[in-house]
UniProtKB/Swiss-Prot annotation:
PANTHER family reported for this sequence: 4-DIPHOSPHOCYTIDYL-2-C-METHYL-D-ERYTHRITOL KINASE, CHLOROPLASTIC
Keywords for the protein's UniProt record, in alphabetical order: ATP-binding, Isoprene biosynthesis, Kinase, Nucleotide-binding, Transferase
Pathway of action: Isoprenoid biosynthesis; isopentenyl diphosphate biosynthesis via DXP pathway; isopentenyl diphosphate from 1-deoxy-D-xylulose 5-phosphate: step 3/6
InterPro entries: GHMP_kinase_C_dom, GHMP_kinase_C_sf, GHMP_kinase_N_dom, IspE, Ribosomal_Su5_D2-typ_SF, Ribsml_uS5_D2-typ_fold_subgr
Taxonomic lineage: Bacteria, Pseudomonadati, Pseudomonadota, Betaproteobacteria, Burkholderiales
Active-site residues, record numbering mapped to chain: K16, D141
Gene Ontology terms for molecular function: 4-(cytidine 5'-diphospho)-2-C-methyl-D-erythritol kinase activity; ATP binding
Name this polypeptide is given: 4-diphosphocytidyl-2-C-methyl-D-erythritol kinase
Keyword Kinase: yes
BP terms from Gene Ontology: isopentenyl diphosphate biosynthetic process, methylerythritol 4-phosphate pathway; terpenoid biosynthetic process
Amino acid sequence: MTDTTRSLRDCLAPAKLNLFLHITGRRPDGYHALQSVFQLLDWGDRLHFTLRDDGKVSRVTDVPGVPEESDLVVRAASLLKAHAGATLGVDIEIDKRLPMGAGLGGGSSDAATTLLALNRLWRLDLPRTTLQSLAVKLGADVPFFVFGKNAFAEGIGEALQAVELPARWFLVVTPRVHVPTAAIFSEKSLTRDSKPITITDFLAQRGIDAGWPDSFGRNDMQPVVTSKYAEVAKVVEWFYNLTPARMTGSGASVFAAFKSKADAEAAQAKLPAGWNSAVAESMSEHPLFAFAS
């Protein structure tokens, strides 16, 4: 990352994995109550920010299928500007590297990186708690990325406790299919009554259920998604013969954990031709963590 008084270049918006995802009920406001552990990855979109003196917020790169006015990075910048009364503007460039609609948190991570980067570039010095309160207005996963640490998450994903996770490598396979999150949440067959756990339960029992270190529980959305999307089911089945794996979020990406980069790349080399995949290392902290106190 390059940091100058007028710009911030090459800011990573890291992907996330849900190491498990349990749906424990439905809240009075209609949202589902979740429990999960979020894992940061050293892989994601790259964002570039350049100050404007005219106060305008502008996305200067095209993102197919995402109009500028509805892009989370523009909404995040505009929300922060209005909250803080900032007089400066910004040009935002996005180098999209994460697949969209894959359960990796791409758009949410872009929004969080925007909040953190502009907190520095606009010299706002807002505390992390304030940025997180703004992040909730942008989407359920955005507060986690602003929080900036691997976390045990509850509520709709906004109640976060930092959790220490060991370093490891992941192979992430993303089928070429878009899974609409809202449609999966509305499925009648979706499990909505998983027994609530505590962070102590996770720390004590991880590694037992799925056979890999730090595994725990399941992804309650996975059976629904694999029953409706053959492409996702095919990836899960392929992994079944090699190593334990799990879908992240509402899909479509499926991941497996490995002790080393070499092990992850060896598994990647066995994938059928044409499958979309990436090998990524775990992270313990968001690269812009220091941009909020």
